[in-house]
Amino acid sequence: MNGIFLVNKKAGLTSHDIVYQIRKKFNIKKVGHTGTLDPFATGLLIILVGKATKLAFLFDELDKQYDGTIVLGKSYDTDDTTGEVINEAPVSFTEDDLKAILNRIVPTYKQIPPSYSAIKKAGVKAYEAARSGKPLDLPAREVSIYNFTYQINKQTIDFSTHVSKGTYIRSIARDIGLGLNTFGALSVLNRTNIDAYSQNMSKTVEDTELPDLIDHALLFEGVKKIVLNDYLIKLVKNGVVLDERQTTLNEPFIVQDEMGNYIAYYVPDNQQYKLKYLF
């Protein structure tokens, strides 16, 4: 069993809880995920199983889409409403004020990650430092917000957004609050899409069954293929580096045997090609 499950995570569960539940349900030793969802968040979580646990790199650069709610007037140490309140301020703003803030952060801005995050600095995880009372001074990182639609409801803002990898929605909530001369925190978050993978395609762990597995070969449908003879296939299975004698492609490709079976996935590397994944 090698591939991915699209799981619809419930609130209150960690991403590791989902990994454990899938491992236990299907009696699979190798299980992982492609990107953490906070425990209070819901929505799409891509679970890797079997050999596909080595394919997380395929998902690293993918955009994500979310729905959520921002609560204004209070700041929390976690930048979401599961944390401790650390500041309060009155809320008074117009839609034009909100539009002005969005014009500053859409389509790109320098974002400081939340103190409670898994980012490491000098080998220390930010959330561990924050819990010890010594939060890290995290550098700002450029992120992209491709779209941000909203509905204002007095002291809350319901929104839908499409963002680049590495974007923290909690930080967006915090920064919108500060831009409105108050505070902001995330109270609801639901991940609806990871690139072409949709929450509508996902199931809860309880409803997930073996036929829902997307085979790892299907993750490479749009990738170029080359066919090698039996002698070279044996070398490929041992991790041999390929070069211009086998192909001149300047992009990743699948190696197939003469029967059309997927054998390996290779990527360009200094005018050669190195093995990235064995089927």
Swiss-Prot record:
Disulfide pattern:
none
Spell out the family assignment given in the record's similarity comment: Belongs to the pseudouridine synthase TruB family. Type 1 subfamily.
Q: What is this protein called?
A: tRNA pseudouridine synthase B
Q: Which gene encodes it?
A: truB
What is the purpose of this protein?
Answer: Responsible for synthesis of pseudouridine from uracil-55 in the psi GC loop of transfer RNAs.
E.C. number(s) listed in UniProt: 5.4.99.25
Q: Which GO terms describe its molecular function?
A: RNA binding; tRNA pseudouridine(55) synthase activity
NCBIfam families reported for this sequence: TruB
